[in-house]
């Protein structure tokens, strides 16, 4: 299975678990508990990625990035954001990757 197929397949499974919960499913559990639980897991996994990177443990870092990616996908489904939405935004940003720092647009303050 190629890279996009793995990501698409996982995303489709997550969407399916939201629409048709399966008893005992961890993904279903996250959706049942709601946004606060999902956000808590995204935060936890983000911290674990940082720690694994700091500890220079490549195998652990890969695992933690996978965990974070999964939980980000759960968040995306919860907030009705599609993979295509992310791909379109990344495509827009890709055009600016080679820009020099002083040529970049300033980021609006939140």
UniProtKB/Swiss-Prot annotation:
PANTHER family for this protein: HISTIDINE BIOSYNTHESIS BIFUNCTIONAL PROTEIN, HISTIDINE BIOSYNTHESIS BIFUNCTIONAL PROTEIN HISIE
Indicate yes or no for the key word Transcription regulation. no
Per the record, the pathway is: Amino-acid biosynthesis; L-histidine biosynthesis; L-histidine from 5-phospho-alpha-D-ribose 1-diphosphate: step 2/9
Q: From its record, what is one biological process in GO terms?
A: L-histidine biosynthetic process
Which keywords fit this entry according to its UniProt record? Amino-acid biosynthesis, ATP-binding, Cytoplasm, Histidine biosynthesis, Hydrolase, Nucleotide-binding
Q: Is this entry keyworded Hydrolase?
A: yes
Listed InterPro entries: HisE (IPR008179), PRib-ATP_PPHydrolase-like (IPR021130)
Natural source organism: Clostridium botulinum (strain Hall / ATCC 3502 / NCTC 13319 / Type A)
- Indicate where this protein resides in the cell: Cytoplasm
Q: Specify where it is mainly localized.
A: cytoplasm
Instruction: Look up the EC number in the record and give it.
Output: 3.6.1.31
Reactions catalysed according to its record: 1-(5-phospho-beta-D-ribosyl)-ATP + H2O = 1-(5-phospho-beta-D-ribosyl)-5'-AMP + diphosphate + H(+)
This protein's name: Phosphoribosyl-ATP pyrophosphatase
């Amino acid at each position: 299975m190629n890279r996009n197929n793995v990501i698409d397949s996982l995303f489709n499974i997550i969407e399916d678990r939201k629409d048709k919960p399966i008893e005992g499913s961890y993904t279903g559990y996250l959706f049942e508990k709601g946004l606060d639980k999902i956000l808590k897991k995204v935060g936890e996994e983000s911290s674990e990625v940082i720690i694994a990177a700091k500890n220079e443990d490549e195998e652990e870092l890969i695992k933690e990035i996978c965990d974070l990616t999964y939980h980000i996908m759960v968040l995306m489904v919860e907030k009705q954001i599609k993979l295509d939405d992310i791909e379109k935004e990344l495509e827009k940003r890709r055009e600016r990757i080679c820009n020099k720092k002083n040529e970049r647009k300033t980021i609006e303050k939140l």
